[in-house]
Amino acid sequence: MSARHVWIVVVLGLAVGPAQAAEDLFPFVVAYDAPANATNVSDWLPKPAGAQGFLRVEKGRLVNDTGPVRVWGTNLCFEACFPPREQAERVARRLARLGINCVRMHHMDSRSIWGDSPNKLTIDPKKLDRLDYLIYQLKQNGIYTNLNLHVSRWFDEAEGFPHRQSRPNYDKGLDNFEPRMIELQKKYARDLLTHVNPYTRTPYTQEPAIAFVEISNEDALFAVWGWGQLDDLPDPYATTFRKQWNAWLRKKYGSTEKLRQAWNVGAAPLGEELLRNGDFSSPLGREWSVERDPQTVCHVSIETAPPGEPGALPAKAPGTKGTKRKVTSPGAGAPGSAAAPRRFLRIVVQRQGQVAWRPQLVQAGFALKKDSPYTLTFQMRADQARRAAVSCMMAHEPWERLGLSADVKLTSQWRPFRFTFVAERDDPNARISFTSLSPGTYELASVSLRPGGIAGLEPGQALEDDSVPVLRRSQMHLTRQARHDFIDFLWDTERDYWHGMYRFLKEELGVKALVAGTQLSYSPAHIQAGLDYIDAHSYWHHPAFPGRRWDPQNWYVHNAALVNSPGGTLSRLAATRVAGMAYTVSEYNHPAPIQYAAEGFPMIAAFGAFQHWDGIYSFAYNHNTNFEPRRIEGFFDIKADPAKLVHMPACAAMFLRGDVAPARQLVRAAISRDAERAKLHETTSAWNIHAGQFGVDPLVALLHGLAIDLKPDASAKPPHIEKTGAVFLSDTGQIRWDVSQPGGGYFTVNTPRTKLFTGFVRGRTFPLGEVMLQIGKTRLDWATVSLVALDAKGFDAPGRVVVAATGLVQNAGAKLEPLGGDRVTLRNRWGHEPVLCEGVPARIILPVPPARVRFYPLDESGNRRPAAPVEAAGDRAVLELGPQFKTLWYEAEILR
């Protein structure tokens, strides 16, 4: 009888599978100790870390003296990097038991490491001692350290840097070119890395357990300039930037006259108006429309200001709450205040729609020509500091952007905004949209869209006196050559910074750890490829803050499952990996309170192993001094989130132990240096440097390995990959991503030693090789189930098997507030301890006789509770999981 017929018989013998509804949620928090039981995989970590030699890169892979190495890491942030000694010992043991073999020390430089020092220039020795002891304990438990040099230190008057609130957050981008900031970065690196750890008795420069050093997190001149955060730099920083720009131009052109000749080619004055009723002199008619949905509550009116008065603006919208904050900069596209208009449109938003972009104000019906410039101008203000968005896009399917998509920072004062953009394609029916209006009051006036607006070198601007201004991201009104020159200037300035810091660390300080600059998508790939390894970050539905950044009362997440979006974050990460270089993802998470978040780490562990990545880090383990809570504390910390922790043995098995095989074929997207520069000239953004922009669909990564090739053969062409339907099967046959049922996607892993299911059940049975999985009724019709053979080569041989099964997990008292669509929030009502969990009813059928199997529910520490019965399906053992056991993990012992 064929294997297929055997399974049919087994399934029929089990009738419809488990039908029991999930009982009430029960408390379950993975214990903070590290007993030697089946859930403790610390034996997989060689001890001490670094005993097998320094990590290095050979043929694009992390290796030590014994062979290839992978990193399954996590992050500690702020004060969590400086625990007391007893806590350092406990956390090191707990991380090791979970299979975590590297800790990224993040946000140390914000305030924590300076301790009692009068400024952020001198490390507090007491803090350094705590860090030293933690790193020592991590090393003893087989855990490497990744040291981040600059994350969130923000210089102020105490360090001799004025105008902090008018500079970019944490001085990012600015620190790529401001000379004294660069010198102070070097001082900090020298002070930290050359000191001798009294517990390991080695300086960090020579410590093999210090595996990685990252120069600056999510920091790049390209990115920060692209966000408009350098548009309104105060002096002396603006002068420094302008002088460096003029020096670069002098080196290229030699004289103002040659510069003028090059830049004035293609200048285009403003043409005829394309919009109607942009001054709101007529009543709202067909020209302007406000898009709403059934949830949207907003009021729109045209107002006229009395003579000599700017027009009254309510302090806040009726029925809304606002938080006032200091306004320090007019924001993108706004060089200064504007005269108050006589007539303006007032939009009072009381409730956003089912999607975050509603309500939105739209005017459509005009045509754009590809590669032609257009200039949008308007005046705008709000009842308090708020953000809005403006875009130019198709007024028809597929609703694609046409060259303009910008955030607008609003204050209570009228500000002029100007955006010059180049149309990305011809379109006969385009539209301008004002959108992302959170609850509040907004006023808009003098809206104009005209072709042209491109200028060359203006009269009075000269290289001899450094008077050629820096190009503002919000005012891309210069000629093609001028824009390209500025992008090339950013490239050269960034390259000199990153490569200069790298040489300082390697040559002057003698750092033996692997050094990375920052993350891809912030900085160009060819620049970051000049360092030791490539790094990236990604989040599935990062929390969004419609108003003030990190406002604990005003945020939402999309409560959606990745399994329903093939590729998602994972294929995009694959599309930025650089062929021939070690690749890590040092931040990844599916943030709370997404109810499907348990899928995140098992999926990226399997996918990363298939893609042959070198390191993956959860973000984060802990952000504070409370290392052992019994509640989920926020979006990111996993320390008390059982849905993420109980699957860690499976993650470590798939990624660290290598249970998931690498792809058999690697697909390369060719991106030469010239091609990357050309894409930056076109888009001005490093976010667009990925395989999908260079002829290879990122979904290829669900079938094969994927990387970008920075040194392609001149004749290289994008490979032809056959399109698949709704089922994506890896070329190894081990990973299946199935979206054949709309809204009912699932992801499975089938290897000899690890099995995984995550997704929607829909009454289906899931064969995982020789193991069969049936899942009963759960609250979301969704679950994540992992199985790991700890000792044996398979599930039919003697040894222990760890099983984890998770469904809904939440704090006691936490209630999601729906905001429309899939958007949800808790505001600041995260609930209280303990974490409450759903017991998943399921049957697991093993390919061994029942008499050979013992089955144990496990307690919060992973210790055995009284044995549960093992049922039979023919000659096969059936493990019955369920809420009656009040646990998320189990142990099966297969006897000889």
Where are these regions (language model features)?
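Bacterial N-terminal signal peptides
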Residues: 6-17
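Active-site mouth of glycoside hydrolases
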Residues: 48-273, 396-412, 418, 422-503, ...
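Catalytic-core region of carbohydrate-active enzymes that cleave or remodel glycosidic bonds
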Residues: 194, 496-516, 523-541, 556-722, ...
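Extracellular and organelle-lumenal recognition/adhesion modules and their flexible linkers in secreted
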Residues: 266-469
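Proteolytic-maturation and junctional protease-sensitive modules
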Residues: 510, 840-881
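Long, low-hydrophobicity ectodomains and other hydrophilic envelope-associated domains
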Residues: 652-653, 657-848, 853-857
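C-terminal beta-strand-rich structural cap/linker in extracellular carbohydrate-active enzymes
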Residues: 875-896
